[in-house]
Amino acid sequence: MSFTFNWPRFSDQFHYDAMQMLNTALNKGNKPPIIADKIEVVELEMGTQPPELEIRDIGDLTVDQFRGIFRLTYAGDAHLVLKTKVQANPLNHKQPDIHLMVGSGGMLAAKQPLVVPMLLRLSHFRLSSYVVLVVSKQKGITLVFKTDPLQNVDINSTFDSIAVIQKFIQREIEGQLRQMFREDLPGIIHRLSQQWVKAKVEAPYLSKHPPPPIPPEEISEPGDYGEEGEFPFGSPPNHHSLDPDPKIVLRPSLNNASIHQLSTLSHSNHTLSPYTRSLSHFTVRSVPPRGIGPSGLSASFERQPVKAKRKRTYRLGGRKPPPESVPAVPDSPERASSPIPPSEFDESDMDRYFRSYDDHSRPPNIRQYRSHLHPS
């Protein structure tokens, strides 16, 4: 079984993220004493030649996840450029393996620190190792090296003219690279793959544009209810109809008078107050309508009042006693302007149940009471 790798030019965002992660990995932990400043990645190029994978074992193979053991071989043209500052005075460096002045009789250099900038170029990587590769659509890519992958790397620096320093830098950089392949590179690949998986998931939604804002609809006036857009009261309105230009918009009117009337109506329903203002499209059963006709009263006032269902009248005599004459009280000018609707209670019942002050002041006449029970 063979694989064909698609190894295109990586995006600028990928290079930027990889450089930031390499900066963090190279400056982690204790650096050699010859390094006098932080290590910064200046240039990163992934090259044009892909690595080679030889299948050794397939452990898990599903639609969303793949796990296998491979033999990785890479001999491409990728390169890396680093920038840092080093301690150039060999006597200030306490390593016994640097002997720059071998054979000198007694000539010594100054023991003052001498920090100079340095550029490092790492190229011609040769990698060969057994790796465990796990590819998951949800968790990303996990790559673990089972053996030391670094076989060879060419390191060019500012001090290539000095052979001793060039060998020392070569040895130090190779040690740092082996540690990075073993500890830091699997984490870098995993974090980069998580960003790649996240971009794959979010990519279909990036092409979708948000829906256009809904234009503000006009608020209908009370006079618009009689037009074509009015729905019949026998059937409820269809709120899900796709009418491009609705005539009626079910929104509260921003009228202070209407709000005040609704507040009065709500207050009267809570307190059972009969003094409620009449509202259009509302029916209040506490009082009859207050419309005034040409005769001074409404048409409902001219007919006989309907007595309440719970009203009960108890009469002790066989016939209704003649009503007592009540002196007419002249109406005041204020009352003459507003006619009073007829009462639903009989005056005889009111005289019987609500007696005058004189009747309450003296004891009742038993004979008169009996005469009412047994009329002659």
Swiss-Prot record:
Q: Which domain of life is it from?
A: Eukaryota
Q: Where is the composition biased (Basic and acidic residues)?
A: 350-362
Q: Name one GO cellular component term.
A: ERMES complex
Query: How does the record say this protein sits in the membrane?
Result: Multi-pass membrane protein
Looking at the record, which segments are called Disordered? 207-249, 286-376
Keyword Signal tagged: no
Q: What does this protein do?
A: Component of the ERMES/MDM complex, which serves as a molecular tether to connect the endoplasmic reticulum (ER) and mitochondria. Components of this complex are involved in the control of mitochondrial shape and protein biogenesis, and function in nonvesicular lipid trafficking between the ER and mitochondria. MDM34 is required for the interaction of the ER-resident membrane protein MMM1 and the outer mitochondrial membrane-resident beta-barrel protein MDM10.
Q: What is this protein identified as?
A: Mitochondrial distribution and morphology protein 34
| Chain's gene name | MDM34
